[in-house]
């Protein structure tokens, strides 16, 4: 009798396992993926929902009050921020061959700027960025564009 009981438990377990695997297999893959749609195209540069979500994280990192805004307002601000950055980049390319600054200069600027978060080294900055789902290459690009834009404006006016 005990063999029959063990056999039934084993059969029930296999049935449950099979059911779970079928459910997981047939679930739409979209449930597990972040949706990425093209939102805009600015001078042949595409802005996607992932770009906007990264920008929301970035703005939230540098502006504590931004975190309290409603989701729609955050989305609009982030989208407009990306558009402005692309326009700046397009204009900068008219005056500069390359939009990139010296690594040492960018590193010092970033550490100084993020010192309000107790950032004293590049390692600390990397940790802060990773913690917020951001990448240093994106920050580097943002800093380069903004500082070169400021320089261009000062030269023009």
Residue spans of the language-model regions?
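Short, low-structural-confidence N-terminal segments
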Residues: 1-80, 127, 131, 154
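Peptidyl-prolyl cis-trans isomerase
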Residues: 70-157
